[in-house]
Amino acid sequence: MILMNLIEALTNPDTFFKKLSQKEISLKEPFLIVLIFSILIAISAYISTSIIYKIFPPQYQQVLAFTKIIALISTFIGGIVAWLIIAGFMHLISMIFKGEGSFKKTLSFTGYGFLPNIVGALITIPIAYYMREISQQEMRL
């Protein structure tokens, strides 16, 4: 049931959000979407910093190893913080235009808005990983 709803959110967002506006607001699914997105962007950041990490000489790599961990943690937290900031901004705009609705509803709708980002991350992570493999092979040559 959840998967069908998420597919509808991607393929027919008008219908999905109309149905969603009629239901009781729950933050479970939107939070799960943002959590998955945050995990995926953290993985992507780790892969990207791993590529950059290999460029530096060995004497700097120990210091830069910490950078990979910071990138992993900060992008994970950043995904969740971005959700809150974007929802807050959207709610503020809604208030300016005399919109009605709770912040919880805005937070919920904004969370579902992260769904296409998951699809994008699922496409870009394998590409980034492949690029990492290519860069490692080039360094061995």
Swiss-Prot record:
TM spans (from-to): 32-52, 69-89, 109-129
Key words of the record: Cell membrane, Membrane, Transmembrane, Transmembrane helix
One Gene Ontology cellular component annotation held by this UniProt entry: plasma membrane
Membrane topology: Multi-pass membrane protein
Short name of any one Pfam family annotated for the protein: Yip1
Keyword Flavoprotein: no
Xref: InterPro entries: Yip1_dom
UniProt keyword annotation of RNA-binding present: no
Superkingdom per UniProt: Archaea
Main location: membrane
Localisation: Cell membrane
Protein name in the entry: Uncharacterized protein MJ0794
